[in-house]
């Protein structure tokens, strides 16, 4: 390990009380990001080809085959379509809509889990950076008063503290905001696809033909 880099990191952490807090927030953000990426990769897939196969079996009246295709699919949408197809045996539109609504809410809850953390971090990180700025300015004026002399060297440490803390807070906030918007876009895409697929299946079952 290069001691220069280690010293630089330690010095940055010592610049302000805000820096360790921002570091912890960054570590938590990255950990949740990795967990959510893995979950979305496994459970948030949208497969139009799977839906087309299910749809073709429904048009032919082969509900068991359609259920089997849905059961082989992976992800929350496949689970929801399988449940809707199970309810389709009764050909009761209200029952199918009820099942679709339940799975819509379930999908929204599972995909939306922990996303609020990114929104919270994007909001409070700049405030922590601002706190670091205030503390840095206070340190600069304190050093100036204790020195009894003026000059840029006296206040340099306090100003650097303010700038580093502010930059770190903005960096964490921007990163969290981008992550939140990305997952929010994915969430809306999955929910819209689920609603369209489910409603189309229910309509085909109800009227007995393709739409």
Predicted segment positions?
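Hydrophobic membrane-targeting segments
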Residues: 1-51
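Residue-level signature of catalytic and energy-coupling elements of molecular machines
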Residues: 16, 30, 66, 81, ...
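Alpha-helical transmembrane segments of integral membrane proteins
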Residues: 19-32, 119-126, 172-176
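Predominantly long cytosolic amphipathic alpha-helical stalk/bundle segments
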Residues: 44-131, 135-149, 181-211
